[in-house]
């Protein structure tokens, strides 16, 4: 992600006081149906009619998630080698996931079984927002993840600028990333960039603003 930003003149070392890149993984071994268990999934369908049991869950290494947790000042995750946790902040979905966790529902990744480290979801998210939108990410031991499962890469960063004008320089570049001719010509793949400067300033003033940039797997491999 950082290398792609440099293509449009956004040098992370120059514009961000702090930034971290973290991958997110998916695999057919962990779908919503498998993550919740059959009984709880069937119950969830009554409330969320659009969900499918074959929808892929998102997975993160515990070391990667804890980098984000430290940046946002949230609780870090502690799990043993045979355990997993789920982070989230979207109450309606968290409530359903808690039912699964409370009964000790186990998941299987690459032939190894993992049990819940907590009996409920840990409050958390991987991209800051004024709305609670995180429906759940499985946090697993680093060794549980295979690199071929990598699907997205996130970059979370704090602007260096102290004034609204300084931050606006980076803001304008970030929100226009998907239309940038340099990126399109480089054929690095699909990119999504979000900035919450306006909403954040309206509610909390102009402190350090956290943004995230998500890139699909194809982008990561081409620029790594």
Residue ranges and their predicted role:
Residues 3-220:
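Basic-flanked hydrophobic alpha-helices used for secretion and membrane insertion
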């Amino acid at each position: 992600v950082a290398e792609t930003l440099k293509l449009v003149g956004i040098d992370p070392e120059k514009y961000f006081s702090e930034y971290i890149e973290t991958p997110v993984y998916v695999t057919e071994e962990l779908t919503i149906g498998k993550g919740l268990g059959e009984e709880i999934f069937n119950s969830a369908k009554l409330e969320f009619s659009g969900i499918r049991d074959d929808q892929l869950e998102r997975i993160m290494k515990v070391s990667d998630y804890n980098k984000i947790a430290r940046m946002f000042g949230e609780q870090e995750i502690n799990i043993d080698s045979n355990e997993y946790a789920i982070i989230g902040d979207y109450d309606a979905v968290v409530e359903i996931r808690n039912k699964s966790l409370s009964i000790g529902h186990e998941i299987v990744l690459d032939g190894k079984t993992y049990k819940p480290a907590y009996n409920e979801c840990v409050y958390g998210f991987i991209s800051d927002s004024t709305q609670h939108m995180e429906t759940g990410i499985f946090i697993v031991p680093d060794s549980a993840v295979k690199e071929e499962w990598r699907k997205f890469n996130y970059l979370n960063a704090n602007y260096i600028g102290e004034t609204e004008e300084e931050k606006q320089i980076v803001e304008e570049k970030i929100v226009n990333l998907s239309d940038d001719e340099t990126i399109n010509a480089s054929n690095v793949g699909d990119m999504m960039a979000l900035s919450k400067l306006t909403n954040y300033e309206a509610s909390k003033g102009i402190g350090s603003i956290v943004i995230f940039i998500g890139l699909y797997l194809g982008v990561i491999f081409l620029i790594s």
